[in-house]
């Protein structure tokens, strides 16, 4: 009897696991080799949880066949790419899809059959704007008309698809959610960038007010607190863009006492300005999230913030994670970001060491010659960075360690010059320890920054300058994102 019960339990467990698994077979008749890569759009998901042990990297064909199990609890969008062939798959538990790459006529094509194929035929939605066509527009009328036109065309395409292919209710619900938020997503994404094309005009504030009013009307037309929306990749795209653009807009309004009190309640003006100056990015976005969103949408907005922290700036990362864990102890996103959270905990525990050297009087330097004098007779790589600069954080995380490892037994000095970070010495020290930025450090004043940019020809951040032993210097040719091998070659030629 006991043995029978165990067998029944194992059988139930097997059936449950199978029901949570979708099978996809890719057949490549164009080539026996090659690879398929996957991207998970929408709310952050764990590729390891979906794909298992082989989650990292791409997946390779063997004799033209690739079989992949995907673990899903509900209809999940997955974007695949294989050479020039790419598209969305909407995968449900129990699906058994066959995706065939072949030549039909004079074109490479994709044919999808099998269980779940009714959710995965060609849909033909228009999901992006031709930004070039509107690049000189200072008012939103034309782009709004185009968005409305696209929306109507997409609605027709979806209804045509439903009639022809009979997709599942879950697919129809997902498409309805995506369509509901697409106009808002397109407008917020476009208008946020478009302001840079007219910000030098005398009537900038009046123009921006027109764009803001149109955006508000789109926001009022939908419910951005809808808990159902958290499953939509389009809503997540909107939410991430909205947080970015709202943050930028509020930066321009921080002198307004009403705005300041909303986001820094209970503080004096001086306290609020100090708090805002210390972290106008991660911590400020967290304040926005808690002011603007509730429930599941608040949790999703936190996930967007954690995703940005994972990608670039780690300022106040541990404190934000602590608050998120306390607020949502059972959140699925804690599993998604577990590797990043572990890394943050480890790095936050680091302290400054004697190899992290702050040049005495460096904050008072007014010209690049004073910097050169301090490193006279040395080969030096200068990293121009800033605590506020996302790409700087990305490049330090990616390249600082490998560069130091490469030149470990060679006479190369590493120097980090922070820019536009006056008054943020304590914040800089935390980041320097966090990223283990061993080397020489200067927190430049504006005069020094301007002189360095003028003399070296650097035009932005991050930038890299190589100083030779004879005191001459040159700008890195490695570009951005950094071509590390190119920079290594340039430094070695300077030794």
Task: State the predicted function of each range.
Residues 1-24, 386, 494-495:
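Bacterial Sec-dependent N-terminal signal peptides
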Residues 20-170:
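A non-transmembrane, solvent-exposed segment enriched in polar/low-complexity residues
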């Amino acid at each position: 009897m006991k043995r029978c019960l165990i067998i029944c339990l194992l059988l139930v467990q097997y059936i449950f696991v199978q029901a949570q698994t979708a099978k996809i077979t890719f057949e490549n008749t164009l080539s026996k080799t090659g690879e398929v890569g996957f991207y998970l759009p929408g709310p952050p998901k764990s590729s390891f949880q979906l794909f298992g042990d082989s989650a990292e990297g791409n997946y390779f064909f063997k004799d033209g066949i690739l079989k992949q199990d995907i673990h899903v609890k509900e209809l999940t969008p997955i974007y695949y790419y294989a050479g020039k062939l790419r598209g969305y798959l909407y995968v449900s538990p129990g699906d058994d899809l066959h995706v065939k790459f072949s030549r039909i006529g004079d074109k490479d094509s994709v044919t999808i059959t099998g269980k779940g194929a009714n959710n995965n035929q060609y849909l033909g939605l228009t999901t992006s704007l031709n930004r070039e066509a509107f690049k000189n527009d200072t008012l939103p009328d034309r782009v709004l008309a185009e968005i409305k036109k696209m929306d109507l065309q997409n609605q027709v395409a979806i209804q045509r698809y439903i009639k022809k292919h009979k997709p599942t209710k879950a697919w129809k619900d997902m498409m309805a959610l995506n369509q509901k938020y697409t106009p808002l997503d397109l407008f917020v994404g476009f208008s946020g960038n478009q302001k840079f094309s007219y910000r030098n005009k005398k009537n900038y504030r009046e123009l921006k007010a027109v764009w803001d009013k149109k955006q508000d009307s789109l926001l009022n037309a939908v419910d951005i607190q809808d808990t159902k929306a958290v499953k939509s990749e389009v809503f997540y795209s909107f939410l991430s863009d909205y947080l970015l653009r709202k943050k930028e807009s509020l930066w321009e309004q921080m002198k307004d006492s009403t705005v300041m009190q909303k986001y820094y309640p209970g503080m004096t003006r001086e306290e609020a300005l100090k708090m805002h100056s210390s972290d106008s990015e991660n911590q400020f976005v967290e304040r926005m999230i808690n002011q603007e969103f509730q429930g599941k949408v608040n949790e999703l907005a936190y996930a967007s913030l954690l995703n940005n922290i994972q990608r670039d700036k780690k300022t106040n990362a541990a404190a934000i994670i602590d608050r998120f864990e306390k607020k949502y102890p059972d959140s699925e996103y804690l599993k998604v970001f577990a590797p990043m959270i572990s890394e943050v905990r480890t790095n936050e525990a680091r302290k400054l060491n004697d190899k992290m050297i702050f040049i005495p009087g460096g904050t008072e330097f007014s010209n690049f010659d004073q910097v050169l004098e301090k490193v006279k007779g040395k080969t030096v790589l200068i990293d121009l960075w800033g605590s506020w600069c996302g790409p700087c954080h990305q490049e330090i995380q990616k390249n600082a360690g490998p560069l130091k490892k490469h030149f470990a037994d060679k006479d190369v000095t590493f120097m980090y010059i922070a820019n536009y970070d006056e008054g943020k010495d304590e914040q800089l020290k935390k980041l320097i320890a966090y990223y283990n930025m061993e080397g020489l450090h200067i927190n430049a004043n504006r005069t020094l920054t301007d002189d360095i940019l003028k003399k070296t020809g650097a035009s932005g951040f991050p930038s890299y300058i190589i100083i030779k032993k004879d005191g001459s210097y040159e700008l890195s040719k490695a570009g951005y994102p950094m071509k590390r091998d190119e920079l290594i070659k340039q430094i070695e030629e300077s030794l």
